[in-house]
Amino acid sequence: MKAAGEDSLDKFYEAFWGHIKFTLSNAARSMWTGITGARGLPSPACEDTKRYYQQMTRFSTAFALLADVSMFVIGGSLKRKEKLSARLGDVLSLLYLSSCALKFYDQRGRLKDELPLLRWALYDCAFKIQVAMNGIIDNFPNRPIAFVLRRLVFPRGLTLIQPTDQMGHEVADLLIQPSAARSRLIAGIYLPDDENDVIGKLEAAMHAVIAAEPIEAKVRAAKKAGRLTTHGAEAQWDEAMKLSVITETELAQWKRARALQHDIIMVDDFDLHFGKQVAAPAWQQAEAAE
């Protein structure tokens, strides 16, 4: 851009051909890293995150290639092709988020208990990057160039997968019970003590449900042993208290946990007449007031 503003054809050609060489080298590198799965690329000396650094390097190269080719072929019209430019923006954002996650993990001392969180986040980002890049190529206006781009960016096809259910379970296990990793993750976020606040109620429900687990275990054991003969949760718990399986305090503790749990899972639960008065025309509201 500087060369274009100067009255020097030599400087312009130097910058122009330098950029062409850069794009061609990115094309070759993108194809090679796609074939090899980015294996062999330099990365920080940490086996737990090595492959993620390599994959993000591969996608950074592919992104530079797609952005350069898009500008070269589409030019100023790229800003009017909003879905195409938005996908390029998605890739850039996801690369940035992936870099932040890796840097965050590295600077906090590469704590092993945070690895499931990092793994899930990077699998998710990598898959979404793949989807966005595939969308760019699928909708590229110049189809012959799109054909070439697909061979350069995805020489082995779409090989990345979404985070597996097992990864999700590992993350959930960290988040649904108190742990050092969970405490570090939520440090500094808004977390009120008020149970009338949705976030505060969620935190209170977690602690209440965990505290009630040993009590529930005693009731289940009594039921399995045939000591409880009633049906229905409420009746069984009342019977368990009468038989001294649990104390009155434990029964109250279980009921509180059950109530909090019920409130948390009842999403989009509104009164039957919620909003009816506001939705009614003004003349109907006036008649109702009379």
What are these regions (language model features)?
Residues M1-E290:
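Flavin-dependent oxidoreductase catalytic core characteristic
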